[in-house]
Structures are given as C-alpha cells and as structure tokens.
Amino acid sequence: MSSLSSAPFGRVVTAMVTPFAADGSLDLPLAARLAQHLVAHGSDGLLVCGTTGESPTLSWDEQLALIKTVLDAVGEKVPVLAGTGSNSTAEAVEATREAAALGAHGALVVVPYYNRPPQEGLEAHFRAVAAAAPELPLMLYNIPGRTGCSLHPATTARLLDCDNVVAYKAASGTTSEVSALRLACGSRLAIYSGDDGLTLPMLAAGAVGVVSVTSHLAGVELSAMIDHYMAGRHAEALALHERLLPLMEGLFCTSNPTPVKAALELQGWPVGAPRLPLMPADSSVRDTLSTLMAALRPT
C-alpha cells in the first residue's frame, strides 16, 4: 500500500485496460496477470473500470468481477481504485457502495456526462456519492472534453468538507487547471495529472502524481521521472519527459484505449480489441506504436 501521505493512491496510478478473450468476454486470469506485471514495473496504484478500461461497454456484473479480480491479485500491495461514476446519481451511489463492499481502496468518480448539469447539480451529485460510502476515499475526475461540462475549482473546494473527497484527476488539457485548484483548495486536495504528456508541468504546478496510460508500457521510466522531479533533480526529470513524450502522444493518436491495447498486443499481451463502438488499431497505428516503443528500448 502507498505510504505517500501527499499522494494517497501512489504517484503512478495505471488506468488499466480491460482484457477480452477472443469471444469478447472478460479475460479475468489475464487481468490478474497484467495487474501483477504493472505493479512489478512501476505502478504503485491501479484504476480499473475507468475510461481506459472501457467502462461504458462493461456490464455492472463484469465491472464487479474485474474489481474483485484485481483486488485479489494486487490489493495487498497497492491501492486499487474502481471507476464508479455515472451521469445518473443513483447509479453512481450504488456503484460506489458496491465497490466499497468489495474492498476497493478508493473510487474514481467522473463528472456526470451528457446531461451537462450546473455547478449546483454537480456539487449535489458528488455529495450524494461521498455520503453513500463515507469510509471510501474518492478521486473526483474532471474531463470536460468527454463529459461536456467542467467541475469548477470553487465547487471542488466546497466539496472538501466531505472527509472522503481526497483527490482529483485533472484532465482538462491545461496545466492552469492545477494552479486554479491549488488556489481554491490549497494542499487539502491531492491533484493527479490525467494527461501523461502534461505530468511534468503539472507536477511543477503542484500535482502529486499521474493517472496514466503510458505506464502500461513505460511504468519504470515514468516513475523515475516523477521521483527525479520530487527529489529536485529537474534536469533528469526533463530528460525522461522528453524521451517519453513521443510515446505519450502516440498512445492518443486515435481513441483511447485502442492504441494502448495494440501496443500491449505488440508486447505479447493478448488483451484483445476494444469493444464496439471503438475499433481495433489499423496497420498504420500499429506501425507507429512499434516504432515508438523500439525507440525506448536501451541501445
């Protein structure tokens, strides 16, 4: 488990892909092996059933099975967060309760999507989720490019009177989001980068870690980059950032998680194609990823 008081879920939290078998069903044994591999290669926290885990295409029974599988595999070593967000408050409340009952160490709760509630509605939504499982630490997740609305810093600051609101995934695509949150919330909120390529500048603005996709492939290097920065070795951190950036950007050349699943396949992890409506990576994406991963190998 993480002992980093300022980073309650660890510094590198991998937003884990969901492996599928050839028939499209969950491959739970592979999910367990992948979780163990990630923890052994730089991840000090895991998130299951997030965007990268294709939660919109998973039934709730599948999500519960996946959460339990990953908890059984690595839950005694690192924090395991469950994605429990929904644009229905009642569904988010129930999902969060069930994740807590399974023993999850935290929940990632996304801003309600599509129905675009006002700030008052967002505040009421998150308060209801927090009250449903008061013992379960929550990470709020702001990603306006996917949800159609944004959680404002002032609203976030008001939510800090819920004792279990402890962290925030910043995925608006700007480092200024971190600065605005720091001004509104001070050090009471652990801010995580939700964009691999912005992790280093977000650390400089006050973030404590990253919820990462790239860590599937370069977790050791990403962890080292953060360690260098936190220890004041900024030149070393910058060098690693620049080395990783092409891969970080390449993993978002089309809709996530299509590229990272293809990259894992290229590394020998048969995680399967994404479920529809997402599509498998085409040959040009696979060729690009192969080149980018080759560039990271030691010479």
Swiss-Prot record:
Subcellular location: Cytoplasm
SMART domains: DHDPS
Reactions catalysed: L-aspartate 4-semialdehyde + pyruvate = (2S,4S)-4-hydroxy-2,3,4,5-tetrahydrodipicolinate + H2O + H(+)
GO BP annotations listed: diaminopimelate biosynthetic process; lysine biosynthetic process via diaminopimelate
Transmembrane intervals: none
Active site: Y141, K169
Site positions (Part of a proton relay during catalysis): T51, Y114
Protein family membership: Belongs to the DapA family.
Protein name: 4-hydroxy-tetrahydrodipicolinate synthase
